[in-house]
């Protein structure tokens, strides 16, 4: 702790001091609330709503509202919020992150700001890490909200649109980050405003906020349709990279988890694929296939990053060790792994809509979160999300003993020592929770314990209900539980009878995670609410963290000591070195996330423009004005492009202009060419615009005004959707190749921003042109109806750029030879099927 902190207290301590007077006000109301009957307590909700309508703010009524929730909770749930929980509730209401240790009752804390903000009628979203916790919390806390007259909803995967809409219209809605994010994307793909399910994003409380806003931050949610690219390219690229020689043709940067071709590798690629310059922008697609094949073969490890089960490649969650069935790496990485493992390669999908959690959660009016471990990432929360981290004091002091790390020379010696330590604790009945970094390590320790005859359970659950059940019993006497570091998060481990007397729950970490936060979470499973407990990390010089990031000095010290395989050292120097290695990785990961946010912000701004335009089309009764503006823009651009006053053949320029506009919006026979040649540019634009408007008015006479207004909306929505989907794909391709600009001393993010903006402008022009063309050529007998441009086939997490990305969903409704539903009379494959 620095000198200033020692004198003035930490930032959190000073902020908590400021909050304590509000807590005193709540406590002063305790006796008043106790005297109220149930009906009088319930009536407070109506009173608060009236006061808010009359101009008071939620801050004005906070002490009373919190006091009401506290008393209602005591009556309904038999749980009364203590002072530290009130502090946590105030921190959340203020739009900050409350760091609260395991067992401090975060679920109950959330009821305070949820009730207070629910009184506004604008909706409160409480985000949990899985469906099981969402259902559990909504059911338990829903009793409390219901008693006070507020409604509770829960969003889980299997709900219909009607059920989702009802849940979102509740005062307080529980659900997972995935479900909320996908619903946002789907709402921006609907063709009738009545199909939307979400309201405006008002206030959210994110449970396990570090997991969602940091660990999952780079993971985009992707709604996808069926792609058209052949899977053969993946096989060819896979065959090519398997012929490469390490260090000669490619190098691996383990710190960045990247594989790169050397100059020799570039030359080999040019020879194999018969291209002149592999790094050329025109070879961006080839680079994409080769890059993903390199990563699949030399960076992704079977049984660590993914498993092959029944002919399918299944992702292993790097934080929980769970199999993530149904989730696919995006960007073709999953297909590259399928080629590597020689299993059936699924067709690459086409992205229809996508957003990262970083950008989804930044759209809320007020964002808050709670977790047991956030302080180590305080800078990132502040810089990316504008969130403060406030450490809330524990209700009882933490008495858990955190032992120094034990460092072993080899992995084998370390695992033997871990098993011996477990057996010793088991002999006296002390419960043990063993944290591993992978399923593979869990199974190795399990097999060694079996040989020793130590009964144990391995937490490798696919079902969160089962996982929660196992974790609940992990604190009972004699219980040994092996789990990946983050498994069972959100479920308390309560100590069984007689366990306190023998030292409480013993935590054994079998490896340091690259993030200190994950290690702290594992430690925090023990010592809840002032219970005794202890934690120790067992480390070997062969662990990934030590091998890749640890200093050579440490390796030298251990070698000099001449340790036996099962001997360990405890050293402050080693512990400091490990912490420095972790800080290095955390800093590196933060930089990656910041860089990716630079890319993603470009798409985010563009997404906002498109979704805003879509919403206006859906909401608006009349988009005719917008169509006429587009018509003028199309004509103006055409005149600027074709009519150059210094042109050698002025008349020929006009002929090209008239021919171009004839295809879009003005019949040739309507234009007086000789008269045009005598006009200025502005006069030409005005004249052609008048001709086009006259033509459009004739079109209106063929239809009723009401019918044409609907057709305008249909055509505009279709143009926006098809062009936006193509644009997403083009931006993906741009991002794939942009990294090579660094070789030309160009900042890739800056280049992406500039070129992406130019592409966006082109897309907007293309939307205008397409919309105008379709409307000026529409026929009564072929008037288009509202149909989705593409049908969702999948919603998945794509792949983190340079790790796994996020979720995806799919679109395929019409046969390729069916008549296109848009009314053109063409076959689907020759019409909208090209876009879908």
UniProtKB/Swiss-Prot annotation:
It is an enzyme of class 7 (translocase). CDD domains: DEXDc_SecA (cd17928), SF2_C_secA (cd18803). GO terms for cellular component: cell envelope Sec protein transport complex; cytosol; plasma membrane. SMART domains: SecA_DEAD (SM00957), SecA_PP_bind (SM00958). ATP binds at residues 85, 103-107, 492. May bind 1 zinc ion per subunit. This is Protein translocase subunit SecA. The lineage of its organism: Bacteria, Bacillati, Bacillota, Clostridia, Eubacteriales. It is found in: Cell membrane; Cytoplasm. It comes from the Bacteria. One of its GO terms (biological process) is protein transport by the Sec complex. Gene3D superfamilies: Helical scaffold and wing domains of SecA, P-loop containing nucleotide triphosphate hydrolases, SecA, preprotein cross-linking domain. The keyword Nucleotide-binding applies. SUPFAM superfamilies: Helical scaffold and wing domains of SecA, P-loop containing nucleoside triphosphate hydrolases, Pre-protein crosslinking domain of SecA. Disulfide bonds: none annotated. Monomer and homodimer. Part of the essential Sec protein translocation apparatus which comprises SecA, SecYEG and auxiliary proteins SecDF. Other proteins may also be involved. PROSITE patterns: SECA (PS01312), SECA_MOTOR_DEAD (PS51196). It catalyses: ATP + H2O + cellular proteinSide 1 = ADP + phosphate + cellular proteinSide 2. Its EC number is 7.4.2.8.
């Amino acid at each position: 702790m620095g000198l200033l902190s020692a004198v003035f207290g930490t930032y959190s301590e000073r902020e908590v001091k400021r909050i304590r007077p509000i807590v005193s006000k709540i406590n002063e109301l305790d006796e008043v609330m106790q005297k109220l009957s149930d009906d009088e307590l319930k009536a407070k909700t109506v009173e608060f709503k009236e006061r808010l309508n009359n101009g008071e703010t939620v801050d004005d009524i906070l002490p009373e509202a919190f006091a009401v929730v506290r008393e209602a909770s005591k009556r309904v749930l038999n749980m009364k919020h203590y002072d530290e929980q009130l502090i946590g509730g105030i921190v959340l209401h203020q739009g900050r992150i409350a760091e609260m240790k395991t067992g401090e009752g975060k679920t109950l804390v959330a009821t305070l700001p949820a009730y207070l903000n629910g009184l506004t009628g604008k909706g409160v979203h409480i985000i949990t890490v899985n469906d099981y916790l969402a259902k559990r919390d909504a059911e338990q806390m829903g009793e409390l909200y219901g008693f006070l007259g507020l409604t509770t909803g829960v969003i889980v995967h299997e709900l219909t649109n009607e059920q989702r809409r009802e849940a979102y219209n509740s005062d307080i809605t529980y659900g997972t980050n995935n479900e909320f994010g996908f619903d946002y994307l789907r709402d921006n793909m609907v063709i009738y405003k009545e199909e939307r399910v979400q309201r405006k994003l008002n206030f959210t409380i994110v449970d396990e906020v570090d997991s969602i806003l940091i660990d999952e931050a780079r993971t985009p949610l992707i709604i996808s349709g069926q792609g058209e690219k052949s899977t053969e390219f993946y096989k060819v690229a896979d065959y090519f990279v398997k012929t490469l020689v390490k260090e000669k043709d490619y190098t691996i940067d383990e710190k960045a988890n990247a594989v790169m071709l050397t100059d020799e590798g570039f030359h080999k690629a040019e020879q194999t694929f018969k291209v002149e310059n592999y790094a050329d922008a025109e070879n961006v697609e080839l680079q994409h296939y080769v890059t993903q094949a390199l990563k699949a073969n030399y960076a992704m490890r079977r049984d660590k990053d993914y498993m092959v089960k029944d002919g399918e490649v299944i992702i292993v969650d790097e934080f929980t060790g769970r199999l993530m069935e149904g989730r696919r790496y995006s960007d073709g990485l999953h297909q590259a792994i399928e080629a590597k493992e020689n299993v059936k390669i699924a067709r690459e999908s086409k992205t229809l809509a996508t957003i990262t959690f970083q950008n989804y959660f930044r759209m809320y009016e007020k964002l808050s979160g709670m977790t047991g471990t956030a302080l180590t990432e305080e800078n990132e929360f502040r810089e990316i999300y504008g969130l403060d981290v406030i450490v809330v004091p524990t209700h009882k002091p933490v008495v858990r003993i955190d032992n120094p790390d034990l460092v072993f020379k080899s992995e084998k010696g370390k695992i033997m020592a871990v098993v011996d330590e477990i057996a010793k604790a088991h002999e006296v009945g002390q419960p043990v929770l063993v944290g591993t970094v992978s399923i593979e390590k869990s199974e190795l320790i399990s097999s060694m314990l079996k040989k020793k005859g130590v009964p144990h359970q391995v937490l490798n659950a696919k079902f969160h209900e089962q996982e929660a059940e196992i974790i609940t019993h992990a604190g009972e006497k004699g219980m040994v539980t092996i789990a990946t570091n983050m498994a069972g998060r959100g479920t308390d481990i309560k100590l069984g009878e007689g366990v306190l007397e023998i030292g409480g729950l013993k935590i054994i970490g079998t490896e340091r995670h690259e993030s200190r936060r994950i290690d702290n979470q594992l430690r925090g499973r023990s010592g809840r609410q002032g219970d005794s407990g202890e934690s120790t990390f067992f480390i070997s010089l062969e662990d990934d963290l030590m091998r890749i990031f640890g200093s050579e000095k440490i390796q030298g010290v251990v070698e000099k000591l001449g340790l036996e395989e099962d001997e360990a050292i405890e050293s402050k120097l080693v512990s400091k070195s490990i912490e420095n290695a972790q800080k290095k990785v955390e800093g590196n990961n933060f930089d990656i996330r910041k860089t990716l946010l630079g890319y993603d912000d470009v798409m985010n701004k563009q997404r906002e423009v498109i979704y805003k335009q879509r919403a206006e089309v859906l909401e608006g009764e009349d988009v005719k004005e917008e169509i006429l503006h587009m018509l003028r823009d199309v004509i103006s651009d055409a005149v600027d492009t074709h009519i150059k006053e210094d042109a050698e053949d002025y008349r020929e320029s006009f002929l090209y202009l008239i021919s171009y506009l004839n295809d879009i919006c003005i019949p040739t026979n309507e234009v007086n060419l000789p008269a045009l040649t005598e006009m200025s540019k502005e006069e030409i634009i005005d004249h052609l615009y008048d001709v086009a408007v006259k033509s459009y008015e004739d079109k209106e006479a063929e239809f009723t005004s009401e019918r044409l207004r609907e057709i305008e909306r249909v055509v505009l929505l279709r143009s926006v959707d098809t062009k936006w989907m193509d644009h997403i794909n083009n931006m993906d391709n741009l991002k794939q190749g942009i990294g090579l600009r660094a070789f030309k001393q160009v900042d890739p993010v800056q280049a992406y921003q500039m070129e992406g903006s130019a592409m966006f402008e082109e897309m907007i022009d293309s939307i205008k042109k397409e919309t105008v063309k379709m409307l000026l050529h529409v026929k009564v007998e072929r008037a288009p109806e509202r149909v989705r441009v593409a049908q969702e086939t999948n919603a998945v997490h794509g792949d983190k750029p340079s790790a796994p990305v996020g979720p995806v969903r799919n679109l395929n409704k019409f046969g390729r030879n069916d008549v296109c539903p848009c009314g053109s009379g063409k076959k689907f494959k020759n019409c909208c099927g090209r876009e879908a």
